[in-house]
């Protein structure tokens, strides 16, 4: 295999499972190499690991600073960078959903709306979703506590990631509709995927054997 493949890895909630996957696949000698280090660039054997914010991973991969990356489907859908999506890694499960105040039934049936004001940390996903419904949407970009927006009259609905739904319930919000399921994905730089086709396919195979996933229909040549 190519000596020197570089992985971009996500800080935060996906990090422990990502490290575990890399270890089980044989790309790390010990999990502690990543879990106990405060370095942002770490070499272990022939591999280099860049530890960064999930939202920066598509940038590192697209521009060739990393050959491969592991990142949530939410980031991929929001940014739509020029990268290959190779494999569903089947962890970090949640979903995009539209939610609204329980006591505002006029926005519960999205099919009857002609316009809506939506708050989200994912404005591009939100715009595309409502455009697909034929609903004019004013999208307000949020950076945190998106559940607050409909409670104070800033928005009619929100589009956000939902896991257990507990945060929605605690804020008297209900899920109106699911937009799409979200999991961690393996992505690749387009040039690296062609130049190191054999090496990257071998990596995909190792991950696939562990997670039982199906490789997307992507032509790496």
Swiss-Prot record:
GO CC, alphabetical: cytoplasm
Cell compartment(s), UniProt: Cytoplasm
Keyword Amino-acid biosynthesis: yes
One Pfam match: HisG
Pathway(s) annotated for this protein in UniProt: Amino-acid biosynthesis; L-histidine biosynthesis; L-histidine from 5-phospho-alpha-D-ribose 1-diphosphate: step 1/9
Cysteines engaged in disulfide bonds, as pairs: none
InterPro entries on file: ATP_PRibTrfase_cat (IPR013820), ATP_PRibTrfase_CS (IPR018198), ATP_PRibTrfase_HisG (IPR001348), ATP_PRibTrfase_HisG_short (IPR024893)
Enzyme Commission number(s) of this protein: 2.4.2.17
Any single biological process term in GO: L-histidine biosynthetic process
Keywords from the named record: Amino-acid biosynthesis, ATP-binding, Cytoplasm, Glycosyltransferase, Histidine biosynthesis, Nucleotide-binding, Transferase
Domain note: Lacks the C-terminal regulatory region which is replaced by HisZ.
Record text on subunit structure and interactions: Heteromultimer composed of HisG and HisZ subunits.
Family of the protein in this entry: Belongs to the ATP phosphoribosyltransferase family. Short subfamily.
Function comment: Catalyzes the condensation of ATP and 5-phosphoribose 1-diphosphate to form N'-(5'-phosphoribosyl)-ATP (PR-ATP). Has a crucial role in the pathway because the rate of histidine biosynthesis seems to be controlled primarily by regulation of HisG enzymatic activity.
NCBIfam families with a match to the protein in the record: hisG (TIGR00070)
Protein's UniProt name: ATP phosphoribosyltransferase
